[in-house]
Amino acid sequence: MSLQCGIVGLPNVGKSTLFNCLSNAKAQSANFPFCTIEPNVGVITVPDERLNKLAELVHPQRIVPTTVEIVDIAGLVKGASKGEGLGNKFLANIRETDAILHVLRCFDDDNITHVDGTVNPVRDKEIIDFELQLKDLETIESRISKVQKQAQTGGDKAAKVTYEVLSRYKEALEQGKAARTVTFETKDEQKIAHDLLLLTIKPVMYVCIVDDNCAVSGNKYVDMVREAVKDENAEILILAAKTESEIAEFETYEERQMFLQEIGLEESGVSRLIRAAYSLLNLETYFTAGPQEVRAWTYLKGSKAPQCAGIIHTDFEKGFIRAEVIKYDDYIALGSENACKEAGKMYIEGKEYVVQDGDIMHFRFNV
């Protein structure tokens, strides 16, 4: 899947440091507002213990995890919607992503200059929200002027539906609400909404960057963010960038786990963030398991068996006959594919089967 999460935020809040932790890439991380001008793209392995447990049973020649793309986008400043700073570049880059990781500075550090002079993550959030909403409002007003007359005077049903969608978005945006807060019931409305490619329709997660000693429970700044986003149904993730940088330096899994235990964490913030980003993109995983490889495959939640087969190869979808499905828990409990067959735990599914997260699949096809 070529879906991407974009890391966004004001300059100097910790975006590039976070990106480096995620990908071990060397995006320039400097105390300078526009050190990330061209977006850095990292293909990040999604941690999944299920893959490792399957491999322990199957003993394949290789193990192939699934991945998600993370894009580090240049810092936005006030006036971006009008092209200020790197505004036009920022808006173009964010439009190409599928979900937003909104990074908020929740730490004090006199050595790292804040563009507005003081630390206030809620103000920072509102600056980004305002710029994105303003750009969306421009898009809506441009479109609405073109269809308004047709919708109000003619018999063009499509124009009327389009006008209704645009009007509802316009009302929400003028109230300072994101487009994602507006929902539509009919498929026609949903298609029109999707085709508008609005910036604030993208799902968002807030990543609060904190000091090392606040990595477990957060701080007063994180509490401010929680209060500000309580009605958004958005996830908040606390992450200490310096701690994560230290974790990334350890060579082995055992060393990392020992360090995490010492600082009171069960797993790294990076691992939690990657999984959360995967979920934010509405992605799930199915597995294939054989002596050559045990592999995780990414698919959009709600996909049916033929579409999931096509992720492996287009011929699998074109010539789809059936899917042989074993539930992950059954495979782990019984220990092998043959044992699952003998226990009646392999299910034969057809074209309408909606693949479930964790399914172990074998596709039959004929081209």
Task: Identify the function of each model-found stretch.
Residues T36, G85, K89, L132, ...:
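Alpha-helical initiation/capping and key positions within long helical/coiled-coil segments
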Residues N24-A25, R50-L51, G75-V77, R105-N111, ...:
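Conserved nucleotide-binding/hydrolysis micro-motifs of P-loop NTPases
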Residues L57, I100-V103, E131, R143, ...:
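Amphipathic, soluble alpha-helical interaction motifs
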Residues S2-V8, V13, F19, K146-V354, ...:
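C-terminal-of-GTPase-core extension/linker across diverse P-loop GTPases
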Residues L76-K82, G117-L132, A151-A158, G264:
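Flexible beta-alpha connector loops of hexameric P-loop NTPases
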Residues M1-T113, V122, E141, V147:
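Conserved G1/Walker A P-loop phosphate-binding module
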Residues K89, R95, A99-H102, F107-K135, ...:
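Switch/coupling subdomain of P-loop NTPase systems
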Residues A30-N31, I112-D116, G218-K220, F250:
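Short amphipathic alpha-helical segments
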